[in-house]
């Protein structure tokens, strides 16, 4: 066996060339966008989501700071967050579920976890409404 010199001996296998090229393309794309326009779009999505919370009986938003990134962590009474995620997935909607790398916070609120929708500038108001239509359907299914 022949060992290479530092730092090369710690780089086993083929470098992530395709990933590096993809990252470069993503950076170029984002650099061409106006950050303030992205922020306005994301805030509009979060605002619409906040308006629709009341349309889902038993839904509670976890984290309601006035100035926050466009994320919505939530729970629905009587439903486990993993079940919410699975049922949304079956309807073509992706959310994150579980402790979300915040176990001390979940323990503080005595929650088994939450579901979290993340909104980005490329999402649409229609997609936010689809999320809430799906949540209403899920809530009715288990009511």
Predicted regions and their residues:
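Pyridoxal 5′-phosphate
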Residues: 1-143
């Amino acid at each position: 066996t022949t060992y290479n010199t530092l730092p090369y001996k710690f780089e086993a296998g083929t470098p992530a060339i395709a990933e590096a090229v993809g990252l470069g393309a993503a950076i170029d794309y984002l650099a061409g966008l106006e950050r303030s326009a992205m922020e306005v779009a994301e805030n509009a999505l979060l605002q619409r989501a906040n308006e629709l919370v009341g349309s889902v009986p038993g839904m509670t938003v976890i984290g309601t700071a006035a100035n926050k990134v466009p994320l919505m962590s939530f729970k629905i009474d009587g439903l486990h967050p993993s079940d919410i995620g699975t049922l949304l997935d079956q309807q073509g909607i992706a959310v994150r579920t579980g402790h979300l790398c915040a176990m001390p916070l979940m323990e503080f609120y005595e929650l088994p976890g939450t579901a979290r929708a993340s909104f980005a500038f490329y999402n649409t108001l229609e997609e936010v409404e689809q999320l809430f239509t799906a949540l209403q359907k899920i809530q009715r299914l288990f009511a």
